[in-house]
Amino acid sequence: HFIETTKQSNARKRNSLSMEKQITIEEIQNFEGKYPKQLWYLFTVEMWERFCFYGMRGVLTFFMVDQLLLKDDAANLQYGAIQAFVYAFTFIGGIFADKILGFKKSLFFGGIVMILGNLLIAFAPQQMFYYGIAFSIIGTGFFKPNISSMVGELYHEKDPRRDAGYGMFYAGINIGGLLGGALCIYLGKYHSWTLCFLAAAIVMVAGLITFLLTKKHLGPIGDSPLLAMPESKRKIREIAVYVGSLLSIPFIYTMVINTDYTDYFMYTIGIVAIGYFVFELLKLGEISLQKKLIAAFSFIFFYFLFNAIYEQSGGSLSLFAKDNLNSNLLGFTIDPNVVNNSSNTFFVIVL
């Protein structure tokens, strides 16, 4: 009886593995209902990552003024440099994912680096702050652009349900932003900064565990674009990306500390980004595809303009809230920076 049970168990395992191997992009995209099940997995992963990101973003300027004893204008400049590097490295991380790593490996690597960055700050907030920030910049650059790309691949190109899928996905972003923006500043100001940054690390661990447990359901979505290449050559390229990214951490640390250098880097990355866009545009050949890419670039341009204004909420508006807002509202005590960090995401969810 024991032998027979073992055989049946092994057979079930083989069948399960076989089913996992057989899942195709067509099977994923031909789902019934409004949302594919894979969307909920990515929703959860992104929710925890945005908790981490918006939690960190909401405390940066306040922490630099309160704990590192920087003046308001110096803290605001360094916050701007940090955010500039975050957006610059999403461009770089997206290229590496698209050309070498694939979305899955890029996302996992980015998550690990973000966790390390938060842990560095958690265990030595004053001493390791800028090193931890450098890790977080690299991690966000590899994580953020790639999970959104995987959501798009859950649908056929002309599937009318794609908009609803992205709407639900961005609801997860706002839920994570609401929770992280409120909880991290509360933990830091009223309990300990170690607990604040540790909470950000813990939720990222939860997000990565969710991803590891569910990535098999994504099938070929997010796999390396170099699967046809011999494994040894592919591994060399992947390791080069990992090592090169980590070796850039002292460079980022120096740029964030010395904000004058940041401008030169941003001018350089801006020229490189435009050059890369022109290169990809000419490579397409077909006019219809070129028009789509130009349209996408237009949206990206206005997205950057929007974020240049929106990110003031983590910098100058954070300082304004700290110094000018009343913490009493209708008899309730609410920290001004909890309101500043979370009001946008709250109203997006409500509306």
PLM regions: where:
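Intracellular loop-helix junctions on the cytosolic face of multi-pass helical membrane proteins
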Residues: 15, 19-37, 157, 185-318, ...
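Short amphipathic helix-loop junctions that connect adjacent transmembrane helices
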Residues: 58-76, 315-337
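Central cavity-lining transmembrane alpha-helices of secondary-active solute carriers
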Residues: 80-97, 342, 346-351
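C-terminal ends and interior cores of transmembrane alpha-helices
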Residues: 112-129
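Hydrophobic core of transmembrane alpha-helices in multi-pass small-molecule transporters
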Residues: 128-143
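Intracellular juxtamembrane helix-capping segments at the cytosolic ends
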Residues: 142-156
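Glycine-rich segments within core transmembrane alpha-helices of 12-TM secondary carriers
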Residues: 163-181, 188, 203
